[in-house]
Amino acid sequence: MTTAMDESLIVHGEGFVLRRWRPDDLCALLRHANDPLVPRGLSERFPHPYTRADGEAFLEGRVVDVRDPVLAIEIDGQACGSIAVRPGQGERRYSAELGYWIGRTYWGRGWMTRIVGTYVAWAMQTLPLYRVQATVLDTNPASATVLLRNGFVEEGVSRCALLKPDGLHDLRVFARVNPPAAVCVPVCASAPA
């Protein structure tokens, strides 16, 4: 497992680098995160407006657990988004919840598809994880497409799961699994009909 002190954590991809956030990323973080369209597809943990105090709190680890691999997405030498998994605990320690966002400048150009593919492959191998899950707001079909293109399967919908300023929304549930064969127990297959 990575730690908050692991500043050397770098994952290279095609045209991008995933790395730990740094204090000198503050201006770039504010530039991309304060766009009013960015938080529309995210939970309200992602504030708008995104203030300097919000950025400082995030970079200091007061918003998310920086012991988890919360990485900056760097394109063209600047941080322009974030991607992370939050590993489960106890009996769920081999599964994790995936979250990500990228600045609007990079939307619609295939960046997140490549970034999610690279990051999830790295996380599943390195941590190790057998399941990575993501929830997608019903109004964010682009994010659902990113997941589907990276081997995620839509498992269902959590109805009326999230209250946003414009009303209640469903959350679509996606997962990518890669369990070792020795661990799989086909419980459902052996259950009486």
Where are these regions (language model features)?
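A short helix-loop-beta-strand connector motif used in the catalytic cores of GNAT acetyltransferases and
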Residues: E60-A72
